[in-house]
């Protein structure tokens, strides 16, 4: 049976592993390295370079060297994050045919999935060279906080690379698999994963082959690239102060600054001071200019202090969702190259109150976990049960723009959930199902994933048709949505297509700001709910007044009409208390009408019973008569 490989498709570096007997093993690439830079370049003569060869020529070919493309995968071109990235990278980010953020290299527009596919192909070739056989199936890792669009785009990249992606697995979960495969005792662990472009925190219970994710949180635009860019900005500012030249306008100089920043960042993890020397960085009328600067670890830490702190809020949220305190975590596993930074280790120790576990290789552990998952799917690894979760709540927009959750965040996947909704208008023949992802109370404040129409609903009063909406999330975290008219059996199903990823601002809006905005959200939701109830009450009161108005006095009819008018006016405003008060007033004014309706229905019921009794009496005679006829018929037929 052909091997299934495990791939960690990283922002900065990628890694590949396989199961070698009962142990996962990292495979070295053609250059003899255990990780491969996630960089693709098109050289001057049109040659495609991937990995280390692409990185080596980046300084001389910055416009055609694509790096950190994972941060663009599944994102729209008009996304604020894309705008931010455009200012920081030397290559061109352009608008794709579908409105997504694409890149341009060698004069050709390509999607992030295509660039990622080139990196995956390099991984595939590495495995084939080692195994001596064709490789067609893989398990690929993604950040736990990747949304549906980003997961879809990653799966597409695998397909483009000629791989059947058997499973998309979350990076922290993969790391936990590698860490805990040989652990028999039950433990609660936190995986703190700060990589090149993304940050994830996952809380898991592991033991005796069961890996259950309790909660996950993160930031899809926070990683080593941001630390590098912060240092690039500092170096450029210092040079401008000294020489009066802005290096950020020079793409060649910018690429040299980036390389120097990355090197300095790595050096400062093991030393307290480093020197940056960039001779002939630029030139002006007075001659060539050189950049020479001493950088201390303390200075670097002060430059990135806010980035380090940004990892703490997701940690708090993950613990809260898991119902745990920091002291209840038995072990904190560090994943991702950035966790080698002493400041990161220090803040993790402060927050969790214990030394983080450093027994795993932060660059390789995710790929090792992916290989274990591949082994599980292939049947080579027995007695391992992995229970992962969906990172964000999923739901639809309902009357008044409310976000109605069908699947809450941190629900174990795969999962399926259905809920019955109805129409908002009389004789409504179609409904639009708008699918959202997020944590805010109003749909507009969340991320729109897609929409579709269910048509052909038979005309009926509002609230009568029954439309069943079903959300289905598979083990890859990819969403399917269907809507079915229970009356006609008509069904419409879609797999949510990649319509752009979640931006940094979007993520903050969804989760981090959710609590800060909880009060506002609560008020807005209360208004919408009060308004919906008011409209239903107005509708039923007007209908009742029309049918039974003649059963009450003129004064009572006027009082009900006035109460309806007052409630309609209140419903146009934003005061939930006022709407509720006017609703109560209408309910009280309509009590006489309700009494009249009840008396009328009782009278109708009594009349119906009397008719039924009379019919029963006459039926007795008819029955005797018919029975004789029946016997006659039988005799005739005999």
Curated annotation (Swiss-Prot):
Sequence similarity: Belongs to the heat shock protein 70 family.
Composition bias, Acidic residues: 620-632
Pfam family, one: HSP70
Modified residues (Phosphothreonine): 198
Entry keywords, A to Z: ATP-binding, Chaperone, Nucleotide-binding, Phosphoprotein, Stress response
Induction: By stress conditions e.g. heat shock.
Function of the protein: Acts as a chaperone.
Organism taxonomic ancestry: Bacteria, Pseudomonadati, Pseudomonadota, Alphaproteobacteria, Hyphomicrobiales
UniProt biased composition (Basic and acidic residues): 601-619
ATP-binding is among the record's keywords: yes
Highest taxon listed in the record's lineage: Bacteria
Region (Disordered): 598-638
Species of origin: Mesorhizobium japonicum (strain LMG 29417 / CECT 9101 / MAFF 303099) (Mesorhizobium loti (strain MAFF 303099))
Recorded GO MF terms: ATP binding; ATP-dependent protein folding chaperone; unfolded protein binding
Designated gene of the protein: dnaK
HAMAP family, per database record: DnaK
Protein name stated in the entry: Chaperone protein DnaK
């Amino acid at each position: 049976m052909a091997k299934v490989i495990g791939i960690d498709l990283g922002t900065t570096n990628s890694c590949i592993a396989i199961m070698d007997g009962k142990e996962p093993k990292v495979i070295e690439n053609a250059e003899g390295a255990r990780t491969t830079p996630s960089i693709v370049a098109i050289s001057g003569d049109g040659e495609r370079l991937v990995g280390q060869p692409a990185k080596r020529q980046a300084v001389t070919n910055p416009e055609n060297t694509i790096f950190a493309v994972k941060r663009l995968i599944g994102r729209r071109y008009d996304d604020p994050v894309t705008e931010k990235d455009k200012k920081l990278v030397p290559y061109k980010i352009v608008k794709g045919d579908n409105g997504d953020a694409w890149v341009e290299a060698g004069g050709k527009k390509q999607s992030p999935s295509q660039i990622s596919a080139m990196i995956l192909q390099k991984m595939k070739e590495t495995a084939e060279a080692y195994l001596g056989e064709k490789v067609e199936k893989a398990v690929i890792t993604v950040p736990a906080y990747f949304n549906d669009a980003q997961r879809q785009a990653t799966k597409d990249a695998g397909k483009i690379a000629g791989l059947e992606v058997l499973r998309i697995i979350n990076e922290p979960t993969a790391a936990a698999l590698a860490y805990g495969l040989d652990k028999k005792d039950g433990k609660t662990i936190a995986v703190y994963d700060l990589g090149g472009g993304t940050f994830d925190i996952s809380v898991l219970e592991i033991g005796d082959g069961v890996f259950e994710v309790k909660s996950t949180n993160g930031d899809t635009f926070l990683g080593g690239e941001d630390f590098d860019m912060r240092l690039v900005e500092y170096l450029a500012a210092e040079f401008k102060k000294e020489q009066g030249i802005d290096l950020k306008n020079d793409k060649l100089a910018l690429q040299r600054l980036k390389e120097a920043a990355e090197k300095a960042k790595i050096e400062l993890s093991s030393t307290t001071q480093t020197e940056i020397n960039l001779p002939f960085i630029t030139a002006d009328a007075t001659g060539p200019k050189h950049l020479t600067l001493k950088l201390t670890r303390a200075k670097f830490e002060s430059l990135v202090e806010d980035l380090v702190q940004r990892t703490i809020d997701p940690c708090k949220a993950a613990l809260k969702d898991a119902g745990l305190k920091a002291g209840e975590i038995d072990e904190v596993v560090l994943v991702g190259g950035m966790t080698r930074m002493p400041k990161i280790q220090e803040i993790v120790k402060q927050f969790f109150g214990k030394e983080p576990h450093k027994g795993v290789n932060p660059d390789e552990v995710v790929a090792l976990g992916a290989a274990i998952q591949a082994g599980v799917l292939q049947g080579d690894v027995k007695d391992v049960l992995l229970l992962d979760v969906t990172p964000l709540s999923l739901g639809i927009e309902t009357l008044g723009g409310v976000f109605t959750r069908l699947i809450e965040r941190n629900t174990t996947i795969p999962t399926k959930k259905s809920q019955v909704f109805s129409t908002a208008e009389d004789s409504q023949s179609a409904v639009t199902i708008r699918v959202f992802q997020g944590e805010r109370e109003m749909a507009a404040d969340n991320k729109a994933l897609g929409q579709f129409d269910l048509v052909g609903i038979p005309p009926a009063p509002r609230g009568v048709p029954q439309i069943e909406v079903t959300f289905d999330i598979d083990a890859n975290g990819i969403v399917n949505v269907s809507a079915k008219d229970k009356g006609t059996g008509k069904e419409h199903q879609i797999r949510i297509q990649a319509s752009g990823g979640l931006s940094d601002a979007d993520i903050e809006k969804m989760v981090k700001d959710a609590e800060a905005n909880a009060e506002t959200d609560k008020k807005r939701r209360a208004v919408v709910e009060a308004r919906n109830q008011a409209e239903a009450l107005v509708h039923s009161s007007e209908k009742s007044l029309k049918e039974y108005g003649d059963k009450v006095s003129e004064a009572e009819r006027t009082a009900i009409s006035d109460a309806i008018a007052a409630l309609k006016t209140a419903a146009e405003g934003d005061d939930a208390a006022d709407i509720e008060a006017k609703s109560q007033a209408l309910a009280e004014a309509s009590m006489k009408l309700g009494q009249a309706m009840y008396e009328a229905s009782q009278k109708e019921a009594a009349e119906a019973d009397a008719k039924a009794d009379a019919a029963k009496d006459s039926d007795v005679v008819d029955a005797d008569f018919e029975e004789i006829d029946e016997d006659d018929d039988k005799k005739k037929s005999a």
